[in-house]
Design a protein with these regions (language model features):
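Residue at a beta-strand N-cap/secondary-structure junction
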Residues: 2-5, 138
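Amphipathic alpha-helical segments that line or abut small-molecule/effector binding pockets
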Residues: 55-70, 119, 127, 142
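Amphipathic alpha-helical packing segments from all-alpha helical-bundle domains
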Residues: 81-106, 112-127, 157
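C-terminal peripheral helix-coil segments that are non-catalytic and often amphipathic
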Residues: 131-170
Length: 170
């Protein structure tokens, strides 16, 4: 069932509350969805990201999807899919920017370059996560994340050094 087919009636019956209670808190089911995704985004991003915790933050997003697999697919297969995409881009953007900035320590890299490199990684990871969702979340996200970051080891610093070197030449 697509999220678009779920009604307020379905939600209140499933939760054992009345319609007035639902409408007291939310204008519609999309407002409820927005609040759920905003709360999850806030929860993941309020963690102080360190070199080891960025990996955990990515896995936390995947874990949220696995724990809420049925609901995620209802949303993913609906007109509200863009909300999932926006959530992923927002979370991954912050994680990758913080990671890239940490890797740039000691280098004279322009903020514009930091953002571009972070966006590169953000798009790569969101693409992998969307592919994982498309495939039914069958692969272990920890395996995928660990493998990707082992491939990337040193490449982020190399990209940043190249950016700093180009900045120094100008």
């Amino acid at each position: 069932v697509s999220f678009d087919k779920i009604t307020v009636k379905d939600i209140v019956e499933d939760c054992g509350v009345n319609r007035n209670t639902f409408y007291y808190h939310y204008s519609d089911i999309y407002a409820l969805l927005d609040e759920i995704l905003e709360n999850e985004t806030r929860r993941v991003l309020t963690e102080n990201l360190t070199e080891s915790s960025w990996r955990d933050a990515i896995l936390e997003s995947c874990s949220f999807a696995l724990k809420n697999k049925k609901g995620i697919y209802h949303i993913y297969n609906s007109l509200s899919r863009r909300k999932i995409d926006a959530y992923l881009y927002q979370v991954m953007g912050r994680i990758m920017y913080d990671f890239v900035k940490m890797q740039a320590e000691g280098l004279s890299v322009k903020d514009e370059d930091l953002h571009l490199i972070a966006d590169f990684y953000k798009c790569a990871f969101v693409g992998l996560i969307l592919q994982w969702l498309d495939s039914g979340m069958k692969q272990d996200p920890e395996y995928i994340v660990d493998k990707i970051f082992s491939y990337l080891e040193g490449s982020t610093r190399n990209m940043l050094e190249n950016a700093a070197e180009r900045n120094d030449r100008k």
